[in-house]
Amino acid sequence: DGLDLRFFSLDLDDLRDAGHRVGGTVNTAFVAAVALGVSDHHADSPSTGPVRVSIPISTRAADDGVGNHWTPTRVDLDVGADSEPDDVAREVLRHSAGLRDDPARSLVPVLTALPDATTAALFSAAASAHDVAASNVPRSPVLLYLCGEPVRELIPFGPLSGAAVNVTLMSYGRTAHIGISSDPAAIADPGGLAHCLQQSFTALVKGS
């Protein structure tokens, strides 16, 4: 009765190129692909509306010290069966630009001063109104070793934090690893969801 965990990988340069193609970044392509995959998975659902994605926004400045330097936010993406991958990526980019002027950013100094447990609780409460939580975990800039042997892959699995699904990206070397955590009580076909997500990443990399 625990979480369902699945993963897949793709070329990091391909994902980066997909983001650059619309003037964005790896994270732009990542969030767009997650929204597309979740939308495809729910294509036969009677419910309609935008895909609500919870994403952490970094607030760290160059001279920041230790502590929390992120704030949770939600983007509502209008994604449907006829949506072109690049168009969804452009919508993500527009939302990201708008977040820089979000009045809620004035609360960032307060959030960064809070204890980790308090910040995590706030993030969990905010995520409960989302369809999926998407996280891009910073990668190691160097090759890692364990017991003298090189680590070949790093597969990330993020907490649900109140959402039904968490999709996490961690790049290692030249590979982007995608980990999917889902609540079996909310996702009846986790294998189907993972397939839809993998297909959406492939479609975004190919372009539209």
Which residues fall in each region the model found?
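Generic recognition of flexible, low-complexity loop/linker segments
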Residues: L15-R16, H41-A43, T119-F123, L154-P156, ...
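Helical lid/core segments from catalytic subdomains that handle acyl or acyl-like groups
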Residues: L3-R6, D64-S140
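Low-complexity, glycine/alanine/valine/leucine- and proline-rich hydrophobic stretches
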Residues: D131-T202
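Flexible helix-coil linker/hinge segments at domain or subdomain boundaries
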Residues: T202-S208
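Structural preference for long, well-ordered alpha-helical segments in enzyme cores
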Residues: F30-V38, V92, C196-F201
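Non-catalytic beta-strand/loop surface segments
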Residues: V51, S58-D63, R174
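A generic structural motif
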Residues: D14-R16, V22, A61, D76-S83, ...
